[in-house]
Amino acid sequence: MLTYETWEENDVSFSKEDETKGALSVLSWAYKEYKSEIVYACSFGVEGMVLLHLINQVNPSAKVVFLDTNVHFQETYELIQKVRERFPSLNIIEKQPKLTLDEQDKLHGDKLWESNPNLCCKIRKILPLEESLANEKAWISGLRREQSETRKHTKFINQDHRFQSIKVCPLIHWTWKEVWRYVYKHSLPYNPLHDIGYPSIGCEKCTLPVGEGGDSRDGRWAGKVKTECGLHYQ
């Protein structure tokens, strides 16, 4: 088994010529390699809808973890329920932070997402994912190379130094148009915020709509240097 500790540049070959640009092949390899020791960390963005549909074909009882920061859009929570109905066999876990919002306010002051967004992300996303990955050998992410400069070198199989794990990224070669084409073709549910200018959807407090021609992640932490929550730093 390929693990963080036994990592070497792997020579596993995945064909990119099929409809899924290698995604199904990558997922089939991952679930064969890691069996029950792999989890998909899903934010329920539009890429997530594609991956959930593909994962359901490969492993209908797969583990899916949603990092519930308690400050997501209501539309996101409603979408999760729709996904549960569409894919009832998937094991969707809504992972909570250890601190409630009130406890966080008492320890760090009100509106931590404004005063110290990095700490807020650490408490409400990074630490919960660390806990979720503690007993796993690998995790799946919906990163695409097209999304941003920080993601353009992502590979199918990555050694993840941040979480000392293997990170599997099946959608690296997909374009934004291809993601949506797949969603429409298979009549997949998606967050209606995508229809009103939100290409990337995170917490309600830190996500704004993006103007025409803007980068897909321009609405995340708008006005701040921050562009990532920290889950995908190496």
Curated annotation (Swiss-Prot):
MF annotations from Gene Ontology: 4 iron, 4 sulfur cluster binding; adenylyl-sulfate reductase (thioredoxin) activity; metal ion binding; phosphoadenylyl-sulfate reductase (thioredoxin) activity
Cofactor mode of binding and number, as noted: Binds 1 [4Fe-4S] cluster per subunit.
Key words, A-Z: Cytoplasm, Iron, Iron-sulfur, Metal-binding, Oxidoreductase
Co-factor(s): [4Fe-4S] cluster
GO cellular component terms, semicolon-separated: cytoplasm
Pfam families from the UniProt entry: PAPS_reduct
Residues that bind [4Fe-4S] cluster: 120-121, 203, 206
Active site residues per record: 229 (nucleophile)
Subcellular location: Cytoplasm
Keyword Oxidoreductase: yes
Transmembrane segments: none
EC number, as in UniProt: 1.8.4.10
GO biological process assignments: cysteine biosynthetic process; hydrogen sulfide biosynthetic process; sulfate assimilation, phosphoadenylyl sulfate reduction by phosphoadenylyl-sulfate reductase (thioredoxin)
Family annotation (NCBIfam families): APS_reductase, cysH, PRK02090.1
Record function comment: Catalyzes the formation of sulfite from adenosine 5'-phosphosulfate (APS) using thioredoxin as an electron donor.
Name of the protein described by the UniProt record: Adenosine 5'-phosphosulfate reductase
Native source organism of the sequence: Bacillus cereus (strain AH820)
Encoding gene per record: cysH
